[in-house]
């Protein structure tokens, strides 16, 4: 899979692996790299079947497949221990990593994640699939901001959104791949296994998230044996982009306590 390794100036710094959401592109984390590389070597990657990682995804593709693909990448780079941060679908990958290879993870940060399907998110993904199949990629991409960002942020960031949408359209994934990735997150359910995950975990959720109810993170915080929840008031589904300072404070406070 396509990946980029952003080195910290401190050679002995720990490694932090970043996993993006449904779009799958490592580009999602661009705004965070300057801060994170002060203290960490940072690995970003494009998920299989997205962006610069071309692949034909199998019909039974799952979040576990995604975790196994990431493990293969980490093995190829001889990364034996790391911190992990995942956004939405990327957070689900983190939960699978913690189940498949718990000794890999120093800690994990899960942003607006969940452990099982919920009716609201299911409705959102149903609408997005219909947009893709009935109106095409352009409508799908233009609607994406409505699910990710607060209304006032959208209104104030037209030029950035136009650039992001042009890039997304230019690198739009194969329709079958995208539908299989959506199906993977729609059917993901590790609720019965959460008590097995002892990895130190920070859950960051946003009260105004239009895509994933923040109560999903509260459930994770209650079910995981070693988890902390930070609930942010503003930022939508992607507050590391829309309101980065509160997000960064929560992230740094947690990571500073991890070895």
From Swiss-Prot:
Cited function: Involved in pyrimidine catabolism. May facilitate the hydrolysis of carbamate, a reaction that can also occur spontaneously.
Keyword terms of this UniProt record: Hydrolase
UniProt key word Hydrolase: yes
Molecular functions (GO terms): hydrolase activity, acting on carbon-nitrogen (but not peptide) bonds, in linear amides; triacylglycerol lipase activity
Enzyme Commission identifier(s): 3.5.1.-
Name of the coding gene: rutD
Family listed: Belongs to the AB hydrolase superfamily. Hydrolase RutD family.
Catalysed reaction, written as an equation: carbamate + 2 H(+) = NH4(+) + CO2
Protein name (Swiss-Prot/TrEMBL): Putative carbamate hydrolase RutD
Superkingdom, taxonomy of origin: Bacteria
InterPro entries documented for this protein: AB_hydrolase, AB_hydrolase_1, AB_hydrolase_fold, Pyrimidine_utilisation_RutD
Lineage: Bacteria, Pseudomonadati, Pseudomonadota, Gammaproteobacteria, Pseudomonadales
């Amino acid at each position: 899979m396509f990946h980029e390794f952003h080195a910290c100036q401190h050679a002995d710094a720990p490694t932090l692996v970043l996993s993006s959401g449904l779009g799958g592109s490592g580009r999602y984390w661009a705004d965070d790299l300057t801060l994170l590389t002060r203290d960490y070597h940072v690995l970003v990657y494009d998920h299989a079947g997205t962006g610069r990682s071309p692949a034909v995804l199998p019909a039974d593709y799952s979040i576990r497949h995604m975790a196994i693909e990431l493990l293969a990448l980490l093995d190829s780079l001889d990364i034996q221990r790391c911190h992990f941060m995942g956004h939405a679908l990327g957070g689900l990958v983190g939960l699978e990593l913690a189940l498949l290879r718990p000794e890999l993870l120093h800690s994990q940060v899960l942003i607006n994640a969940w452990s099982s399907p919920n009716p609201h998110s299911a409705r959102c993904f149903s609408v997005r699939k219909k947009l893709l199949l009935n109106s095409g990629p352009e409508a799908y991409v233009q609607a994406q901001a409505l699910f990710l960002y607060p209304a006032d942020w959208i209104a104030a960031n037209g030029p950035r959104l136009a650039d992001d949408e042009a890039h997304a359209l230019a690198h739009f994934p194969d329709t079958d791949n995208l539908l299989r990735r959506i199906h993977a997150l729609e059917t993901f359910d590790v609720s019965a296994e959460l008590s097995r995950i002892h990895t130190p975990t920070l859950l960051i959720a946003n009260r105004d998230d239009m895509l994933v109810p923040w109560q999903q993170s509260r459930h994770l915080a209650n079910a995981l044996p070693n988890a902390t929840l930070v609930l942010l008031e503003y930022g939508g589904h992607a507050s590391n982009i829309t309101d980065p300072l509160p997000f960064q404070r929560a992230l740094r406070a947690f990571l500073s306590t991890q070895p």
